[in-house]
Amino acid sequence: MLCLCLYVPVIGEAQTEFQYFESKGLPAELKSIFKLSVFIPSQEFSTYRQWKQKIVQAGDKDLDGQLDFEEFVHYLQDHEKKLRLVFKSLDKKNDGRIDAQEIMQSLRDLGVKISEQQAEKILKSMDKNGTMTIDWNEWRDYHLLHPVENIPEIILYWKHSTIFDVGENLTVPDEFTVEERQTGMWWRHLVAGGGAGAVSRTCTAPLDRLKVLMQVHASRSNNMGIVGGFTQMIREGGARSLWRGNGINVLKIAPESAIKFMAYEQIKRLVGSDQETLRIHERLVAGSLAGAIAQSSIYPMEVLKTRMALRKTGQYSGMLDCARRILAREGVAAFYKGYVPNMLGIIPYAGIDLAVYETLKNAWLQHYAVNSADPGVFVLLACGTMSSTCGQLASYPLALVRTRMQAQASIEGAPEVTMSSLFKHILRTEGAFGLYRGLAPNFMKVIPAVSISYVVYENLKITLGVQSR
């Protein structure tokens, strides 16, 4: 029987030996040879049961709930390979040792800022010989029985754009760990995110349609409110009219997400060279370019969504009929109306959303991440809601101008409305407030959209066989 033990040092007392977990299958004569020990700070002993479960899950190949000797050896070999890769990524100077500056730099690349004192504290916990540097042996010995490395754990728990869908797919794509890519879990995350987005958008579609109506039709002379807007929609087309435009809005999730992810992965290789994870500004550049490529590819669907949301009862028989009529009357160029303000809106939305989310993530990791990088449901929802709200607030004037340009049908002989002329017209006739028409229903849908997409995402993950949070 293979027995792994924890020795928990207590100041002023003898060391106490605690059984960590036992594994059957080791010959009795080898028991003393393969008895392993690991030292942890006494304040961390409360987590040893969680560590036990993680190690068993990581190495249990036959899913019998325990480790035999062969499984344990395989676990050690596989885990040592992963630790070697992480050690090399942290060793910026390639001198075989990690110092405090390299720890700070590696975490800074992920958007996690720590002080030099905090880096030295991390260093001291692993440094056995007092050199204030960590060599490979010290790194391996410290982490060998810890089944989750910090960097992949942060990436795993702090997914953002994959989980949260507020209707504006302009966020920077999430990172995926090496293991998620190798095992194919990344596409399951994307499928779960797409399904969550479909349910979330359908549930909040009435608020989204009201936002579009207020962006296009509300003015000083037509002061459309939330109650008045809903009353007008129901009176004109009944309760079903609240979901006009939702079909195309859901339909565009799959192609947009797939194109954006593939473009992001290709651009990452150009921007980040051979680095596994990108720095924040590199993520912003790569994510914005990927978003621009994805939006350019599916932009005609954005125009169709706006036209379908604004249609009167009986105006179009469906999406294809709407597309045919636009093509016949206005030409191909009509499918790219509002394209320029839409592209310009990517930078402020994606940039501020990413900056706010990373700032909140960094603050939480610094102050509350003691034994795990898992923030829990409410922290994740709060961070996602706040970052999405800030991103939308910054890019909203461009989104409003885009929607008005998409809604404008060409009249023969009439001049084309440009982005700059529309901005000037709104400011002259309605003031700065006019650039924020429809903001109230837009913000009203953020919390339910984020909450619904999270719940559906977590349930779809289980269905698709993705490891639960």
Curated annotation (Swiss-Prot):
Q: Which residues lie on this side of the membrane: Mitochondrial intermembrane?
A: 1-189, 265-287, 358-380, 458-469
Q: Would you identify the family this protein belongs to, as annotated?
A: Belongs to the mitochondrial carrier (TC 2.A.29) family.
Topology within the bilayer: Multi-pass membrane protein
The cellular location(s) given in this protein's UniProt record come to: Mitochondrion inner membrane
This chain belongs to which protein, by name? Mitochondrial adenyl nucleotide antiporter SLC25A25
Which region ranges are annotated with the description Regulatory N-terminal domain? 1-165
Gene name?
A: SLC25A25
What positions does the entry give for Ca(2+) binding?
Answer: 60, 62, 64, 66, 71
